[in-house]
Amino acid sequence: MIQKKVTDFFALEGNYPDLDGEGAAARLSAAIRCKTINYFDHSRTDYTEFDKLHAHIKASYPNIMRVGTFERIGHHAVLITIPGSDASLRPCLYMSHQDVVPVVEGTEQDWTHPAFSGDIADGYIWGRGTLDIKEQVFGVLEAAEYLLAHGKSFARTAYLAFGDDEETINLGALAIAEHLKAQGVTLEFVLDEGGCKIEPGTAFGAPETAISSVQLMEKGYADLEFSVHSIGGHSSRPFGGTSLARLSGAIADITRAPFSVHLNSAMTGAFETLAPYITEEPLKTLVQDVAGNADAIAACCMGSPDLFPFVTTPLSLIHISEPTSHAQISY
């Protein structure tokens, strides 16, 4: 019989007896009501909603505003600097982003609560941004405010950096990076958006163990655009094939070409850490020697819908433009 492990995720709550949980929820709820949607075409973005969010932050965290500086960088990115007492220590950077993606038109009725209601109901805060990722923006702010309100000071300078267009082109993050570089800032570490769930380690072969992934790396990416030109004309006379057929063939060739598969250092560390808790084969045996069985472990990951992106480079086809008429062959 396997005895299910039970973890008390609230064991340390007693360490903060005066933590204003209801107030923290209300402040996040108010932030959700700020419709900070950013579009690739920034002319469509309503920056007054970002102004509302900035005003809300300034009003909600008086101790941060008292000891720190609030700067708007670039268009509407935010950099809050909380100075440390020890100049010999390199500063740290806590990152997140203010912007959210729009609600897909026609799906508004599918939301249990309206996307920008910020409703607090059934033990949850509801709305766009509660998981991606205003909860991290306000989690960092709540933590810093709590420490400062209780007379604590920072030995190491802390930067709180909140981009305004992470969901589109990341100009806000770039502006913050350039601003810090111009000041000659060298960071000790960066804490950015990552996994925020506590869940069974089933994907790792440890279904009886609750895990929360700490993301140590960020993969790069590339956007590729393919254009094909052909003779064109009427669809009843597709001499030589159509542009779409040629493009489809190229896409098929690319998606069939495998990228390399390997276990990087972060995944190696993850399996080494989880090894005592992995109960399912073949991983249970393989993780007894993670380095020696790296290729076999990576192959197992390739068979998992949860783990395969961590051992190879995924490729996603997301858009094909369409002709203006069903009878027309695109050039």
Locations of regions flagged by a protein language model:
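Acidic/His- and Gly-rich active-site-bordering loop/insert found
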Residues: 1-130, 137, 147-154
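Active-site-proximal beta-strand/loop segments in catalytic clefts of secreted hydrolases
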Residues: 32, 82-83, 96-98, 162-164, ...
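Acidic-enriched catalytic cores of C-N bond-cleaving enzymes acting on peptides and small amides
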Residues: 6-8, 180-183, 188, 196-209, ...
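Predominant activation on well-ordered alpha-helical scaffold segments within soluble catalytic domains
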Residues: 29, 138-141, 145, 174-177, ...
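Residue-level detector of conserved catalytic or cofactor/ligand-binding positions
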Residues: 316-331
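A generic structural motif
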Residues: 38, 131, 230-236
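Acidic/histidine-rich catalytic neighborhood of metal-dependent amide-processing enzymes
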Residues: 124-127, 131-213
